[in-house]
Regions:
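Active-site loop-to-helix "anion-binding N-cap" substructures in soluble metabolic enzymes
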Residues: 1-259
Length: 259
């Protein structure tokens, strides 16, 4: 049984005060979650404060991005070593906003994957197609290319620590979300692809999340699909009650989530 995973991506939101309040509320609301693993990914500037609040909690700390180099003349960047030192256990990589707004390439994302793994953290590789690519029938082609490039050169041991997230670009921050059936179709394809790229064993154990306008009212319908192992939550993760509800509903297929 793959334990559902729920990740809150706070994006570029949160003053120190807001971040502390949100982290404390999430911690208090998920003291003893059963049947679900929960991660929050705040902005870099509030990682220390949030990490302090989550110390010893059932909710893990993650980051939204990193650089692939250990250190150097990379103005404005943050290395995986720095994130590990702050207590991060997870890092989002290849998010659609990084790919499309900041023009990150598959090669750069692959280098970041290696850096995150070297520092003992777990990477979440995001893949997904744009609205135009979907209209042209290229969904499978796009996500296959992103997966193969992102995982290139990684050992079986490394791949066992990786998580995938399918995030259709047309459903991110738009209020339009893929139906459970649409999401399940791509997740099923990705799981089959993992079997081809890596192994049948990994295909059975790798967790594949869905991200794209996830809210409390659609999380359970999504995670009830057999190949959807949790959700990557954007805007809805900024409201503690809704995020807590999403986490508990996502745990439904593994049994009730208790506080």
């Amino acid at each position: 049984m793959r334990t559902p995973l729920v990740i809150g991506n706070w994006k570029m939101h949160g003053t120190q005060a807001l971040a502390r309040d949100l982290a404390q509320s999430v911690r208090d609301g998920l003291k003893r979650p059963r049947g679900v693993e929960v991660v929050v990914c705040p902005p870099f500037t509030v990682l220390p404060a949030v990490g302090e609040i989550l110390k010893g909690a059932a909710v893990a700390l993650g980051a939204q991005n990193c650089h692939w180099e250990e250190q150097g003349a990379f103005t404005g960047e943050v290395s995986s070593a720095m994130l590990a030192e702050l207590g991060c256990r997870w890092v989002l990589l290849g998010h659609s906003e990084r790919r499309h707004v900041f023009r990150e390439t598959d090669e750069e994302i692959n280098r970041k994957m290696g850096a995150v793994l070297r520092h003992g953290m777990r990477p979440v590789l995001c893949v997904g197609e744009t609205e135009e690519e979907r209209r042209q029938g290229l969904t499978f082609t796009v996500v296959e290319g992103q997966l193969r490039a992102g995982w290139a050169g990684l050992s079986p041991e490394d791949l066992a620590r990786c998580v995938l997230a399918y995030e259709p670009v047309w459903a991110i921050g738009t209020g339009v979300n893929a139906t459970p059936a649409q999401a399940a179709e791509v997740h099923g394809y990705l799981r089959g692809l993992v079997s081809e790229v890596a192994s049948k064993e990994l295909a059975q154990t790798v967790r594949i999340l869905y991200g794209g306008s996830v809210k409390a009212d659609n999380a359970q319908a999504l995670t009830e699909q057999p190949d959807i192992d949790g959700v990557l939550v954007g805007g809805a993760s900024l409201q503690a009650p809704g995020f807590i509800t999403i986490a508990k509903k996502s745990a439904a297929r593994s049994g009730p989530s208790k506080e």
